[in-house]
């Protein structure tokens, strides 16, 4: 008889209230937190401590980060491991200078099956002016996730961390949108061809720098219509991850997105989504003055980052295997 393996440090399920019933018996799940840390390096000790505190509460199976200096997460990973919150390892992209993509994973539950590397190469796809459509190359990884059921094999999956071109167009002729559009086309093509060479789920997530309805992502919406990926269905536009402030009803925008392929993978919309600090969440639901909301948002932006961490819980039905 197979028994469920107890997870003593599953803080995320505690924060969410419980493990969803559909995961209690026959299904396994994987928690991934996406977070743009905005120009983070290990010399910023106050920020490092605050970020470490947040990550110690979340202690996700995998974290995908953006705007990271190389090796700057190593101390955080060691501290989390020393405190018994996992056995974390880190990997960094090589492009983006001091604003790289990074992945941190808990080896107690997730193991890499191949070297973590960047896709495509520099200048593999450019716009007419010669600019690379990927200022930071997508960071690819291939993992095995251990099952929470004893005597059962876990599951393999591919994960690609993204940080696509920002909405800064110095030329004034829409080059940034063209870069994002061509990046999406390239990723869609890779997803349908190269990614399918491995018998596994594929997850693309990161800072896309535009909301899911943006024209640039038409290639993914087309694949979703063909039932080859999930995109709009798993990106709740009523949520927000990037902090700016216009008014009480429009405090941010959803720029941190995800795409997933596989008939087995399921995203729990009820519990997935942006993780907000309770103070901010309570304020947005209350009748507090808009000025108070703005003050809290500015404090978060100043102390940590202008992005909220985004949680996605993916599940795999072992009975379908």
Language model features with spans:
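Active-site-proximal segments of metal-dependent phosphoesterases and phosphodiesterases across multiple
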Residues: 164-185, 213-215
């Amino acid at each position: 008889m197979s028994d469920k393996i107890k997870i003593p440090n599953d803080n995320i399920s505690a924060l969410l209230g419980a493990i969803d019933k559909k995961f209690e018996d026959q299904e396994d799940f994987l928690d991934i937190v996406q977070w743009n840390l905005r120009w983070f390096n290990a010399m910023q000790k106050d920020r490092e401590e605050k970020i470490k505190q947040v990550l110690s509460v979340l202690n996700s199976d995998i974290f995908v980060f953006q705007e990271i200096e190389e090796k700057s997460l190593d101390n955080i990973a060691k501290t989390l491991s020393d405190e018994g919150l996992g056995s974390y390892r880190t990997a960094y992209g090589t492009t983006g200078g001091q604003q790289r993509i990074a992945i941190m994973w808990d080896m107690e539950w997730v193991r890499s099956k191949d070297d973590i590397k960047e896709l495509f190469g520099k200048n593999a796809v450019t716009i007419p002016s010669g600019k690379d459509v990927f200022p930071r190359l997508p960071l690819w990884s291939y993992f095995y996730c251990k099952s929470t059921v004893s005597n059962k094999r876990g599951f393999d999956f591919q994960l690609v961390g993204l940080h696509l071109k920002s909405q800064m167009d110095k030329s004034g002729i829409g080059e940034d949108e063209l870069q994002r559009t061509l990046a999406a086309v390239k990723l869609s093509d890779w997803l349908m061809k190269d990614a399918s060479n491995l018998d596994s789920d594929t997850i693309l997530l990161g800072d896309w720098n535009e909301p899911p309805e943006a024209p640039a992502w038409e290639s993914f919406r087309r694949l979703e219509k063909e039932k080859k990926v999930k995109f709009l269905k798993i990106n709740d536009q009523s949520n927000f991850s990037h902090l700016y402030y216009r008014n009480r009803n429009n405090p941010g925008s959803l720029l941190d997105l995800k795409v997933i392929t596989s008939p087995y993978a399921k995203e729990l919309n009820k519990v997935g989504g942006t993780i907000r600090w309770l103070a901010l969440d309570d304020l947005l639901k209350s009748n507090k003055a808009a000025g108070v909301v703005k003050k809290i948002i500015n404090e978060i932006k100043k102390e940590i980052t202008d992005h909220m961490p985004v949680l996605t819980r993916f599940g795999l039905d072992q009975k379908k295997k």
